[in-house]
Amino acid sequence: MATYDIRPLQLRILDILMAVDKVCKEHNLRYYIIAGTLLGAVRHKGFIPWDDDLDIGMPRADYDLLMAHAAEWLPAPFEAVCFENDTTYPLPFAKIQDGSTTLIERMHLKYLGGIYLDVFPLDGMPDSKLAQRLHFMKYFFYKKILYFIYRDPYRHGKGMSSWIPLLCRKFFTLKGVQETMRRMMKSYD
């Protein structure tokens, strides 16, 4: 396994966050650091030493506004990438990426993007615990279908691990699953 110094990558991601922070302040958009980014900020006073990405969450209205105006609001070389502006984009959330770089992720070999930070929309949830569980189950079902549609079915072995993605591609499209997930995620806003 190759070893490399991850710090320059982390610092470039931090540059992206600073640009996003400036845009959010200028346009009164709310965002929060979340997941491993929040853990790193609290526990390590910065990045988790081995972390190679940054995660923020935005209330849906602010997220949609940022995605709609990112091309005009973000300074070059930063750009927002989401399914709404790139139909080959395989994820149910956005990335703000550095368009002057290329980052190849093993999980998404067909999608070439730049160094990035993830932007997750924060949506409403049902009131009851049962409805919340069903909502999560439905979300994770479609997220798995999305993964099967996008991944290379022959890269991960033979048998079921290769034919399930082929079967999913027969019955689902990337666009259809993305639109279903978006409607579902926004249904409690």
Per-segment meaning from a language model:
Residues 1-27, 70-127, 146-189:
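Conserved catalytic core of two-metal-ion nucleotidyltransferases
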Residues 21-54, 63:
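Active-site nucleotide-donor binding segment shared across nucleotidyl transfer reactions
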Residues 57-59:
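Short hydrophobic/aromatic beta-strand micro-patches
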Residues 64-68:
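Short, conserved charged micro-motifs
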Residues 69-70, 132:
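A generic "cationic amphipathic patch" detector
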Residues 129-135:
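A short secondary-structure junction signal
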